[in-house]
């Protein structure tokens, strides 16, 4: 099926599935098949922020005073987060947009990916402030063995989906020879690759950031690197939205409401999805071990972080219909919720950047009934 950027075939977008229907033609928002994506778009737009709004000048002084093992923890996490958001800033667009059939989902994916580019810019803003030569930090990302291990697990599902999608659009279903290699293009197999890719992205948004988040917030609990923590808090707020988006996509697909065949595929893939999540959790535990190889920090150590990874992995897997792999049922670092739930902290606006401020949140829909109780 050849892809077109504007299909001239008239269709009812309310009858299209989320994926593998007719490509979106008119980007219209007066109607939605799934209004959850419209709500996510509006929420993400109201969250808009720029890293330059946050003052990180004090962080340079704090960073210079950190012991070497804490510098390792801080800078390693920034490298890892830069990798994750470098992938997420481009991959959802490249992998998902050519397959999407409804405008609200198309715009949500574009909005989601754009916000990830702001996260990447934020890490540059932080790193440029604390080190004299940012290139030393960025150049290490593609050579650091610990980071590369994680990159392979994240990018493989995206790459397989993108490759198979290009064959499907160019050649259609069937058995083809491409550069001397036999390629079998099958729509059901492509749907399976999409489902696994979405589950992989869900695992990324669900657990892969949170070891780094916990460390950033632990520094701020000691009144260190507070500018960084404010930025990370804004990033965490965005990531919670992105997680909600992938969870809704997966749950709509596995329920069969959107595409009955996807419900069968979800059942077939259940074990692979389970293994995918457990592997991601294991990699995060290994990352915690790498971070604390030279010593722990006040309020946080490897064991506590590993318990936290197990705790959030259980919650995230349950949200997409998977069995729970770990015994940990309580949050070992409850103070982190103060940072992750943006409404929990009240501050005086003149004293600090207000991370809970929203823009564009006025409801402009006014009905005559709203004025019925007014008397002149």
Swiss-Prot record:
Catalytic residue positions: 123
InterPro entries the UniProt entry points to: Ferritin-like_SF (IPR009078), RNR-like (IPR012348), RNR_small (IPR033909), RNR_small_AS (IPR030475), RNR_small_fam (IPR000358)
One of the protein's GO biological processes: deoxyribonucleotide biosynthetic process
Sites where the protein binds Fe cation 1: 85, 116, 119
Highest rank taxon of the organism: Bacteria
CDD domains named in the record: RNRR2 (cd01049)
Catalyzed reaction equations: a 2'-deoxyribonucleoside 5'-diphosphate + [thioredoxin]-disulfide + H2O = a ribonucleoside 5'-diphosphate + [thioredoxin]-dithiol
UniProt EC number: 1.17.4.1
Keyword terms: Deoxyribonucleotide synthesis, Iron, Metal-binding, Oxidoreductase
Residue numbers binding Fe cation 2: 116, 205, 239, 242
Subunit (UniProt): Tetramer of two alpha (R1) and two beta (R2) subunits. The B1 protein is a dimer of alpha subunits. A radical transfer pathway occurs between Tyr-123 of R2 and R1.
Family: Belongs to the ribonucleoside diphosphate reductase small chain family.
Task of the protein: Provides the precursors necessary for DNA synthesis. Catalyzes the biosynthesis of deoxyribonucleotides from the corresponding ribonucleotides. R2 contains the tyrosyl radical required for catalysis.
Protein name: Ribonucleoside-diphosphate reductase 1 subunit beta
Provenance organism: Salmonella typhimurium (strain LT2 / SGSC1412 / ATCC 700720)
Protein's gene: nrdB
